[in-house]
Every structure is written in structure tokens, then in C-alpha cells.
Amino acid sequence: MSDTLFPCGQLLSAGLFTDQSPFEKRVLMCKKSKRPQKRYFFITKRQSGKVGTNMQEVNLIVQSKGGCGKTFCCASYAQYVAARAANQVEVHCYDTDTSNRTLSRYKPLHVQVINILTRDNNVDIRNFDGLVEQFLEKDGIGIVDTGSNTFIPLMSYIAENNIAELLRESGVRLILHVPIEGGQAQVDCIESLGRILNDVDAEVVVWLNEFHGAVENAGKPFEQFGVYQKHKDRIIGIVRVEKRNPDTYGKDIEQMTKLHLTFDEVDATTEMTFMPKQRLRNVKRDIFAKLESLPVMANALNGGDDGK
């Protein structure tokens, strides 16, 4: 790992890159990015250098609206990152969803459950302290599934404790992944996205879940929404989960999530026949292809153009 890229956030002016430093600056521009003019700074370890003890990138999947495909997006992203980066850095997955611990049931992801409930089943937001400390103590990439019932206290915790700034100053890049579901839930999802962008100074990846309909307003696509136009400099990517036939693909995805199987486990299971497996391979191929365009650490580790 003598030539590995790591995100440096806003550390360019923090004196990190000195003659004595084990790090040197690079600039990443993903080859498949639709916004090639935007530059993302990373650091690369020199031959004699040693990566710091904190994580280099933390991904929080957040949305106040329940049932919008949040855990599916989180599980898909975790599988993608593990496939792309696990041989080069550690990938840490966490489940903080108090009402529906779904991600932790995906055994190959080795998910750690973060219990933020008291004995009376009330949310004790102080328990997030331990999670933040793990961000600062462990090396690699973090992926966190959060619950809709903890959205408000979590956003308050991040804002009140200046978590985004704390992580940035510690060399940890924070990325928020926000699923938006089309159909009846769209208005609530968009309002949640707006609050996230207003309250937290971090980069955002938007997932457009079209299972219940396209994400649009009066015929206008998401890219023309006011919330996107206002914050597009911080929205670093859009992942579109396309609507598919609910009688085939829909039921296949439902069965896969009900069994808590990863895409790789689907290929090995005896509980699905050939055609459902083939359709789920198509879903995996489509989602992974779209994730390749994101300017994230997993892609930087695998041949992203460093701009030199």
C-alpha cells in the first residue's frame, strides 16, 4: 500500500504536507465522473509513511422517512466498497437502527451493532460518542446505517457537537448518503434532504429510488429541483435505482432482502432458481456501474485518475 489514496478533507492548509510528513498531496478526478471539472483532494502514503489511526472516510446513510429503501442502499453500497477496497483497507459497517436492525443480519458484512437505547427503550444520543471515537481510532472506511426514528436526535447530535468539523480536522472525510423515494413519500424525503444539507456541512450522495415512481416534480427531474440547485456544489453524486417490473425484479429484490442475502450469497443459495438469480445479477451490475462514478475512496484505490 505504498501508493494508496486517502481523503484529506480540508487538511491542505493544516501543515500536513511538509518535507518531514509521511504524506504527499494528490488530486483525484474520477474517470467516469459526470462532473470532471470538480476536483477532490486526497493524500497518498509515501514509501516510508504510515497511515494515521483514524478512518479516512465515513459514510452515513440517513433519511427521516422510513420505508424508502435506506437499508437496501446501505447494503448495496457496503457490498460495493467491500468488493472494491477490502483487500487494501479495512471496511467497518455499523447498524444504529433501533427499530429495525436489518443491516446487521447481512453476515458477510460483519456489521457491528451500536446500541443507543436505554433500558426503557428511549434513545440515548450520548451513545453516539462511542461510534465517533471509533471513527477516530480505527483505520479504513466506515459505513453506518441509521434509523428513521433516530434521525432528529442524530442530526441534532452532529450539529451540536460539530461532528463534521471534528472529523474534517482529524482527516476523516464525512459523506452523507440520502435515499429519495419517488411517489407518495417523495415530498417528505426531499424535505429531509433539505434539512440535512442545511444542518450538516458535509458532502452528500443522493440515491433516487424509483421503485414507487420516478423522482420528479411536474415533469422536472431531480437535477432541476430547488434543493439540488441550491446545494449542487456539495452533492457529489446521484445514484439512480431504476424502477423495474414489480412482478419479477420487485419480488426478487424483496426475497433477497427478506432473506438478508448479499448479491454474492444469492448466487450460492438454493432458495432461488436460475432466473431470479440472473435478474439480481442485473441489479447488482447496474448499481455497481453507477457507483463507479462516485469520487469516493473505494474508487480512488482502484485506478482513479489522480490528476498528475
Outline where the language-model segments fall.
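Polybasic, lysine-rich low-complexity intrinsically disordered segments
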Residues: 21, 25-26, 32-33, 38-41, ...
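Nucleotide-state-sensitive switch-loop elements of NTP-binding domains
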Residues: 56-60, 86, 90-151
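Walker A/P-loop phosphate-binding motif and the immediately C-terminal alpha-helix
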Residues: 59-93
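Conserved catalytic-core segment of NTP-binding enzymes
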Residues: 150-251
